[in-house]
Amino acid sequence: MNEPVINELGINNADTYINEFGGLVTDNGHASAEIVIKMTDVSKWYGDFQVLTDCTAHVHKGDVVVVCGPSGSGKSTLIKTVNGLEPFQKGDIMVNGISVGAAKTNLPKLRSSVGMVFQHFELFPHLTIIDNLTVAQIKVLGRKEDEAKKKGMAYLDRVGLSAQAPKYPAELSGGQQQRVAIARAL
């Protein structure tokens, strides 16, 4: 096992296990040799305040990654840089061979290949569970409603919630809502 490389944010090397300080966590027995996310020396500032410092990680296809650390350590910022929601000032991030920071990159298309679930995942309370899974597929990816619902139901089935599809988020437990968020990310 590699020794953890932890910067002042508590995050740096995705090929390490979690330690008491927090960090990026993956299983060193990678599911695939294919690297789908490659982050190299990524740094980000908000004005004079440096939020990310030389973050480097390689995530292989099939890996599950958890980003953890203390409040304000840059976890959300790091994740948002991976899918282009936050610009970064130094380094490079490649997702499926596409540079996130390149001006010509089609960010909506790139984002469709990166699934994330945040601790506070915010389901749309006015939409049914199945509609929570299909809205982005229809509006962002341009899928037809019947195709989006079919995919959404398949993912709800994977997380054991297909029977909950017509319900609203408030009708589900917190754990069930989290599983809906996971299905949506998938």
Task: Please describe what each predicted stretch is.
Residues 2-33:
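Pre-NBD coupling/linker segments of ABC/ABC-like ATPases
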Residues 20-23, 32-186:
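ABC family nucleotide-binding domain
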